[in-house]
Amino acid sequence: MSQSLKFAPPFQSFVDASFFQVFSRLKLDVLRLDSHELPLHAKVDLAGLARGSSISHVFLDSQSFDEATASLPGISLRGSFFNFNTLEEFKRLDKGRFLSEQAQLLWEAGVNGYLDEAAGFFVICFADLKKYRFYYWFATPCFQPETLELKVVKREALTEIDKFSNFIEQNKILCGVLNEETGEVIRASRHELERYSTLVVRDTSNIEHCPTSLVKNFVAVWRHHNPNRSECRVLLLRETCSFSLELSVTGDAMSTSQLKASGWERNVRGLLTPKISELGAIIDPTKLAEQSIDLNLKLMKWRLVPDINLDIVKNCKVLLLGAGTLGCYVARSLLAWGVRKITFVDNGSVSYSNPVRQPLFNFTDCGQPKATSAAAAMKAIFPLVDATGFQLEVPMIGHPLTDEARQKKDYEELRQLIRDHDIVFLLMDSRETRWLPTILGNLESKLVINAALGFDSYLVMRHGNYEQPESSRLGCYFCHDVVAPSDSLTDRTLDEMCTVTRPGVALIAAAYATELAVSVLQHPQGNNAPETSESVLGSVPHQLRGFLPQLSTVKLRTPAYKHCSACSSVIVDAVRENGWEFLREALVDHRIVERLSGLAQVQQETETFLATMEISDDDCFDEIS
């Protein structure tokens, strides 16, 4: 007497955290808003059935997106991955209809290709990458035409399965047909299915007398090619307790038949509902912070700036000369841009007035060196940043030598630091402090960004590339001057010694300085970019001058000045050839620089010209009577 056939679920999924980590990178860097189907390649663990499991596992891990996984030992299973851009879209999906559509695709693959291609799986997923929470649902479509009916005519144990060892050891498929003439199990296309009526299935179930639901798929395809046969034999191979079924197969299994499909996986409570994977709880917090920083930046590439090069920013090594108000705000902005290497140089200590204006310091830092405190604060904000602080004094032109050995050492260390970095920010309080770094930036061909503050105004500029011809080169901070910088710090009142500015000026200038640097990095010509051109982020001006009273900013261009005290060829060459010997003299007497650069001659010519323009009494107009 024939009996109805009961089936076991085909698989239990096991999704490793590495699967979602790979998908996260794929989503951010490649797919972005693209939600097209992705191929998956999984391995079926039948060995686990011998260890007490009732259903075999399908493993998804970091290799599942790699086609090469299919060539690895073990049974391979093809699948598809569908990612949704919003949680609402994931929820709105008609799950029953979607399962039926996927079942139809497997049915057609089995009918038109090989029998084993009627088995497969898919995963639908929404990734909340801000919280590292993944909503997903695994399904293995199992189907049969609505009119198809399967009955068990005979069930018996299989004791001699050694003859199937070649099929088990050498094949990566779940199902084939038995060549009844040779006893060999072969992969089954339409030709073999029309000829043979014994299916051989690697059973993924370990439940007694209860085969995998995939048997329905295989028998339905067999029936399609054998509409006039009503008996089919199925050999179910297991690690233990293999058995055979003789089935009575009735009903229609044509291509136009409506399929009954099932296959959504139940959760641990036995409910038909998606699962949630919370990776945020298991990922190293520092790695999670790194990925979150990258997330915000990579989202720019999705719609807003697809061509932005984030790696060139991330890999840029930045030197901040000055760890005061400007230095702190520039450092925070660079960190937000993903810069990983930031070095501070400052010779001061944190004063009690600093923490309210300089965001890298707090009350407990007062009295500590600024450079090292700023670096420590950056690491506290983001532990993976390579932040270092150097407490050294930048030798200043026009200031007498007080300790030549120490100042020479500071010069050599400063030159090496500039050599080791890609961008140099000049963020100090005085003009003369910026003179030597400007020359060294030219010597080492570095991108130099300069920011300076007034009470209610600011200047942000990029220095021209010294390797360009002087006639077309952009000017530096000192190209406006007709005198060399000198001691501006001595004999100053309290309001002149402190940096007195409107509090918002530093934030604006720091933001412009950072954005200008990043925009230049994005330009194909880098620091050679003409000030009238644009990068993917917009314009790359030479300099910006801002005025808070009018809430205005203007873009200006200043060409390189051939008599400049910092970027003229004679000054740069003098430092290149003579190094500290030249600088020692210039530090003591700034007029040496004026004479060498030609500024002294310009001053003399100007005075002579003005003298000839003096109007004598005889040149006055007659009074009108």
Curated annotation (Swiss-Prot):
Keywords tagged on the record: Autophagy, Cytoplasm, Protein transport, Transport, Ubl conjugation pathway
Residue window of motif GXGXXG motif: 322-327
Coiled-coil spans in chain: none
Gene Ontology MF annotations: Atg12 activating enzyme activity; Atg8 activating enzyme activity; identical protein binding
Active site: 498 (glycyl thioester intermediate)
InterPro entries named among the record's database cross-references: Atg7, Atg7_N, Atg7_N_1, Atg7_N_2, ThiF/MoeB/HesA, ThiF_NAD_FAD-bd, Ubiquitin-activating_enz
Places the protein is found: Cytoplasm; Preautophagosomal structure
UniProt keyword annotation of Cytoplasm present: yes
Signal peptide segment: none
Domain of life: Eukaryota
GO terms for cellular component: cytoplasm; cytosol; extrinsic component of phagophore assembly site membrane; phagophore assembly site
One GO process term, biological-process aspect: mitophagy
Pfam family, one: ATG7_N
Keyword presence, Cytoplasm: yes
Stated family: Belongs to the ATG7 family.
PANTHER family: UBIQUITIN-ACTIVATING ENZYME E1 (PTHR10953), UBIQUITIN-LIKE MODIFIER-ACTIVATING ENZYME ATG7 (PTHR10953:SF3)
Subunit details: Homodimer.
Function according to Swiss-Prot or TrEMBL: E1-like activating enzyme involved in the 2 ubiquitin-like systems required for cytoplasm to vacuole transport (Cvt) and autophagy. Activates ATG12 for its conjugation with ATG5 and ATG8 for its conjugation with phosphatidylethanolamine. Both systems are needed for the ATG8 association to Cvt vesicles and autophagosomes membranes. Autophagy is essential for maintenance of amino acid levels and protein synthesis under nitrogen starvation.
Record's comment describing the protein's domains: The GxGxxG motif is important for the function, possibly through binding with ATP.
Name under which the protein is recorded: Ubiquitin-like modifier-activating enzyme ATG7
Protein's gene: ATG7
